[in-house]
A protein has these predicted regions:
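Hydrophobic/aromatic-rich core segments of domains that either
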Residues: 49, 54, 60, 99-178
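Conserved structural position at the C-terminal beta-strand
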Residues: 301-305
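Active-site rim recognition segments
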Residues: 72, 81, 137-226
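Short, compositionally biased P/S/T/A/G/V-rich stretches that sit at domain boundaries
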Residues: 211-258, 262, 320
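Short beta-strand segments within Ig-like beta-sandwich modules, predominantly Fibronectin type-III
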Residues: 276-284
Length: 320
C-alpha cells in the first residue's frame, strides 16, 4: 500500500533531490608538510586572482628556474631542496620540474599531482617515459596537464587546457591538439609537438592510480616495475570531479543536512535560493537546517575555495 491508501499524514520534510557524489580514489597529491609549503610559498610570485592564471604563472616560473639537463637529483622529492641546488648552479630534468611545479601549486592551494606518461613500447625502450603535473583548476572545473620541462600545455580548439585523461583519449583517437607554450617558459619548441604527444599512449598517477581498458604491462625497459596503489580496468576514476558534493543527514534540533567535498582546499559551501537569490555561507561541517516555512524549497549548493565558487549542485526539498 502507498501513503495515500494508508491514509497517513504527509511527512514534515521530504527530500526530492540532493547533491550526491561518487567515491573517489585517493588523489595522491604531491605536497610538502606545512613548514615546507610555507618555505616554498615564500619563494613564489604572488598568486593571481584565478586558479588558471596562477597555474600558468607558476608553470612559466618553474620552467625558467633552470635549463633542462639529463642530470638527476637523488635527494628527497622536495621543491625547496631542488631549488636550493638550482641556486647553486644545478640543472635537472622533467622529474624535478614536475616535483617543483606540483608542490608549488599545492602551496598556493591548487590541487596538483604528478603524472607519468609512457610511449608505446615502453617495456623495451629506455626513452619512453615523461613526467608532468596535473592540476585541478577551480575556475575551469576540470583537471589540466602542465608540462614543467617544456613550459607547455595542450589546448582544445577553443583554447581550453586539456587533462592527462583527455590527452590519452586524443592520442588513441589520433587527434593531436595544440601544443601551447606562448604564455609560459623558454624551453618550449612547437616543432617537438608530435614527439611529446607520443608519450600519451599510457598515463598513470605517480605511485597512484593506473588505468587501462585492455591488457597492462607493469614493467618498463630494464625491469623497473611501474608501481600503482590501484590498477583500474577503466578510466572512470582517472579525473575525479572536485566540485562534486555529497550529503549526509543529521539532527540539529530537527532534520538538517551536512555537505562534504573531496576538494583538499575547500573552505565551505555557498547555498543559494533559486527563487529569492538569497545566499548563505556554510563553514565546513556546518549544518543546513531543513526547518522553515511550509513550501517547495529549491536551492543550489556549491563548494567554495580561495579562488572561487565551483559548479553548483541542486537541492530540492518540501517542508509542510
Amino acid at each position: 500500500m502507498n501513503r495515500d491508501e494508508m491514509d497517513l499524514p504527509e511527512p514534515v520534510v521530504e527530500l526530492a533531490w540532493w547533491p550526491c557524489s561518487r567515491p573517489i580514489v585517493p588523489l595522491e597529491l604531491t605536497r610538502l608538510n606545512r613548514v615546507g609549503e610555507a618555505m616554498t610559498r615564500a619563494r613564489l610570485p604572488k598568486p593571481q586572482s584565478s586558479a588558471l592564471a596562477t597555474a600558468e604563472q607558476l608553470l612559466a616560473w618553474v620552467n625558467n628556474r633552470w635549463l633542462h639537463s639529463s642530470t638527476s637529483y637523488f635527494g628527497p622529492p622536495d621543491a625547496n631542496m631542488i631549488l636550493d641546488r638550482v641556486a647553486a648552479g644545478g640543472r635537472f630534468g622533467s622529474v624535478e620540474y614536475t616535483i617543483v611545479l606540483s608542490q608549488a601549486l599545492n602551496a598556493v592551494e591548487i590541487p596538483a599531482r604528478r603524472l607519468v606518461l609512457y610511449a608505446d613500447g615502453y617495456h623495451a625502450r629506455q626513452d619512453a617515459l615523461h613526467h608532468v603535473t596535473e592540476a585541478w583548476i577551480d575556475d575551469l572545473g576540470k583537471w589540466i596537464l602542465l608540462d614543467g620541462r617544456n613550459g607547455a600545455t595542450w589546448r582544445d580548439s577553443d583554447g581550453t587546457p586539456l587533462s592527462g585523461l583527455e590527452l590519452q583519449r586524443r592520442y588513441h583517437a589520433g587527434d593531436r591538439p595544440e601544443f601551447n607554450g606562448a604564455r609560459t617558459g623558454r624551453s618550449f619548441d612547437a616543432a617537438e609537438a608530435e614527439n611529446w604527444f607520443s608519450y600519451f599512449a599510457m598515463v598513470t598517477a605517480k605511485d597512484g592510480l593506473a588505468w587501462t581498458d585492455g591488457s597492462y604491462v607493469p614493467v618498463m625497459a630494464g625491469g623497473t616495475v611501474i608501481r600503482s596503489s590501484r590498477l583500474a580496468d577503466s578510466d572512470v576514476d582517472a579525473a575525479p570531479d572536485l566540485s562534486a558534493i555529497s550529503t549526509s543527514v543529521t539532527d540539529r534540533g530537527g532534520p538538517a543536512l551536512v555537505f562534504h567535498t573531496d576538494h583538499p582546499y575547500a573552505n565551505g559551501f555557498v547555498v543559494s535560493d533559486t527563487t529569492t537569490k538569497d545566499t548563505t555561507f556554510l563553514e565546513l561541517d556546518e549544518a543546513l537546517s531543513l526547518a522553515g516555512e511550509p513550501g517547495d524549497q529549491r536551492l543550489t549548493v556549491a563548494v567554495t575555495t580561495p579562488y572561487c565558487s565551483l559548479s553548483p549542485r541542486h537541492l530540492h526539498y518540501v517542508t509542510r
